[in-house]
Regions:
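Ribonuclease/tRNase effector modules and their secretory precursors
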Residues: 1-147
Length: 147
């Protein structure tokens, strides 16, 4: 196994919007921003944030750059979140290994992978708590992030 199976955690100071509540304009924004991050990765490589570095160092997870790039190239955006001033997306891979798919949280500002975990392929989140999401959150990314 390349990654730890994910557990749902609530993060202080974080607001989230599930992709099912995105407007058409918001869908365009987050997918364009993802393309920008992908281009950054292709030019300078994948960078990982301190949180993920700590998880790797502490043995909480393993990390694969190859699997992370596959996720960037072939995934669905599951949610958008704002944590402090950072704007992030959660990507769920279409590529499965051992009946698991990789999920990564990527900063749209820095391009770094914030965290990474695995989900079962058949996990359709029937137990997902809708109270963790704000369907009224307005996604309004700066133009330089969506070009």
């Amino acid at each position: 196994m390349d990654f730890q199976i994910g557990t749902v955690k609530k993060t202080q100071g974080q607001v989230k919007k599930h992709a099912s509540h995105f407007t058409h304009k918001e869908v365009e924004q987050v997918y364009n921003a993802r393309e920008r991050v992908k281009d950054l990765w292709l030019k300078r490589g994948i960078k990982i944030g301190f949180h993920l570095q700590d998880k790797i160092r502490n043995g909480e997870t393993k990390f694969s750059y190859e699997m992370t790039m596959k996720t960037m190239l072939n995934s669905t955006i599951v949610e958008y979140n704002e944590t402090g001033a950072d704007k992030r997306i959660l990507l769920r891979s279409h590529y499965s290994k051992n009946k698991e798919v990789q999920c990564i949280v990527v900063s749209l500002i820095s391009g770094k992978v914030i965290t990474s975990y695995l989900n079962k392929v058949d996990d359709v989140h029937k137990t997902l708590d809708p109270r963790r999401y704000d369907k009224n959150l307005k996604i309004n990314l700066p133009k330089h992030l969506t070009k």
